[in-house]
A protein has these predicted regions:
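Terminal-region recognition feature
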Residues: 2-184, 190, 195-197, 201-210
Length: 210
């Protein structure tokens, strides 16, 4: 027989709680700053998809036009999720008129942008112009085709000259990738201002006859 002084190996975990009652140390702590930051980050992540609201979405559907998120769902390969590119963190910025993403289309990565007409009629300001220019430049650097879904009222007038600056930056970026990667521009609805000029700089343009 083994001596009582010899410690025998065992698979039992000495820290296991054998009773159904959890010790006080196992009680989940109250939410702290980290939990609040995670919650706020999740709200910011979903803000672009919820910025419009049911009324504006209904108006878009009444015009027999899809929202930008529905167009992305049609474009992407089944079973894949778009990688939405965020930049405009802050009040009324992300989700304000422009969505940029990387999607799997036909088995390859494609850079995609689309105006969200349900928010500010898809109009552009300087911040969103930079966001658009960034995804265009990304397409050129990574050798990805670019698909643009244009549904915009042009520059955001309350932003003043900033709206024109935004389109100027996007125009410059699109011209620089011309001949480097193909760009397919789709026209939806009644585009005005830069919303009608920018697509003409693409490799191909698709628009309805009316």
């Amino acid at each position: 027989m083994p001596s009582k002084d010899i410690v025998m190996p065992t698979l039992r975990n000495p820290f296991d709680v054998e009773s159904d009652e959890r010790p006080e140390s196992a009680v989940a702590p109250a939410p702290g700053p980290y939990d609040e930051a995670v919650r706020e980050g999740e709200l910011l992540r979903v803000r672009p998809q919820t910025a419009a609201g049911p009324v504006q979405i209904g108006r878009q559907h009444a015009k027999r036009r899809m929202t930008v998120w529905e167009r992305i769902d049609v474009l992407r390969d089944p079973g894949t999720e778009p990688t939405v590119l965020y930049q405009n963190w802050g009040p009324n910025l992300d989700g304000a008129s422009i969505v940029t993403a990387i999607c799997q289309i036909g088995g390859r990565e494609v850079a995609v942008y689309g105006h969200d007409f349900t928010v500010r009629a898809g109009s552009m300001d300087a911040t969103n112009g930079t966001k658009l220019a960034n995804v265009i430049r990304l397409a050129g650097r990574q050798g990805m085709p670019l698909v643009g879904m244009n549904d915009s009222a042009g520059a955001f007038v309350p932003a003043g000259i900033g709206g024109l600056d935004g389109y100027a930056e996007a125009f410059t970026a699109l011209r620089k990738i011309s001949g480097v990667v193909p760009s397919i521009m789709c026209m939806f609805g009644y585009n005005a201002g830069g919303g009608s000029y920018l697509p003409r700089q693409g490799s191909f343009m698709i628009q309805p006859s009316n």
